[in-house]
Swiss-Prot record:
Enzyme Commission code(s) on record: 2.7.1.72
NCBIfam families hit by this protein: APH_6
Protein name per its UniProtKB record: Streptomycin 6-kinase
Gene that this sequence comes from: sph
Family designation: Belongs to the aminoglycoside phosphotransferase family.
């Protein structure tokens, strides 16, 4: 099968790259078939199915010469991609997908193949699913961050500098007060940002069924920081479902209790850094033109307040 047949670029991925990176993104998309062909040859891989795409990457299932099933993951080289390679090399497969090889020039990763058809969201019992996620996260954040990884202290400091402009952009006085409250929580913690290696995006959809372990994490965007900053994606998992069940406060508090217990976190610090994630998300939304806080973020913050 020709490379051009294997590498069918999904239109949403091409459009996303054109929108985010302009001509650079379009050129990267156009060069993908040739890059895949080069890497298949260099690493002696055989394509084992059609390509698929994530939010920012193209994934191609392959076989190594010894029959090992793997995937090529290709995405535009950037800081987050380099951080992911650093994190995966440091974790070395402990609780996370294993990095088998990588190409420094293109930032392409050769990863062990997991079962992309079965995420942790398939586990209906929320306590069971959150227990799995908490166990994986505890393993990941037990590892000290290597030198050179982007740090939460710098990220949080930059966030605080943006707050006055962001507050002015909000239409509702209640939203302004809440954004300032989140910023105050971060300001109290920014002097001790932590030194653990964080995943940054560990939710149910980023945990896949595997062979060497029942479940493994995927798609890290590592940074050095306090594990409390890593809780929000887990708390937000299956959000529409828990809203539909009209049980948001109980589920959020139950998840928070489980996560902080398994990770051994100080609850006040964990809540403060979770407000930091809500602040980060809000700043991005406001930068994109929003004049109101996300109702889901407001609801989650209310569930944590006083708990």
């Amino acid at each position: 099968m020709s490379t051009s047949k294997l590498v069918e670029i999904p239109e949403p991925l091409a459009a996303s790259y054109a929108r985010a990176f302009g001509e650079e993104g379009q050129a990267w998309i156009a060069a993908l078939p040739a890059l895949v062909e080069e890497l298949l040859d260099r690493w002696e891989l055989t394509a084992d199915g059609a390509s698929a795409s994530g939010e920012a990457s193209l994934v191609l299932p392959v076989l190594r010469t010894d029959g090992t099933r793997a995937v090529l993951k290709l995405q535009l080289p950037r800081e987050e991609t380099s951080a992911a390679i650093t994190g995966l090399r440091t974790w070395n497969g402990h609780g996370v997908v294993r990095l088998l090889d990588h190409d420094p020039r293109s930032s392409t990763m050769l990863l062990e193949r997991l079962d992309a058809s079965r995420t942790l969201a398939s586990v209906e019992d929320d306590d069971a699913a959150m227990g799995v996620l908490a166990g994986l996260l505890a393993r990941l954040v037990s590892v000290p961050a290597p030198r050179g990884l982007r740090g939460l202290g710098d990220i949080a400091g930059a966030m605080l500098e943006e707050v006055p402009r962001a507050v002015a952009a909000l239409a509702d006085p209640a939203d302004r007060r809440l954004l300032n409250d989140w910023a105050s929580a971060v300001a109290e913690l920014v002097g001790e940002p932590g030194d653990r290696m964080l995943h940054w995006d560990l939710h149910y959809g980023n945990v896949l069924a595997a062979e060497r372990e029942p479940w493994l994490a995927i798609d890290p965007e590592p940074l050095a920081g306090d594990p409390g900053f890593d809780l929000w994606p887990a708390l937000d998992s299956r959000w529409d479902d828990i809203v539909a069940q009209r049980d948001v406060v109980r589920v959020v508090r139950r998840r928070f209790d489980l996560l902080t217990e398994v990770l051994g976190l100080d609850r006040a610090r964990a809540a403060g850094w979770t407000y930091g994630r809500l602040l980060q998300n809000a700043l991005w939304d406001i930068e994109d033109g929003s004049a109101a806080l996300d109702p889901a973020a407001v609801t989650l913050a209310q569930a944590l307040r006083g708990h």
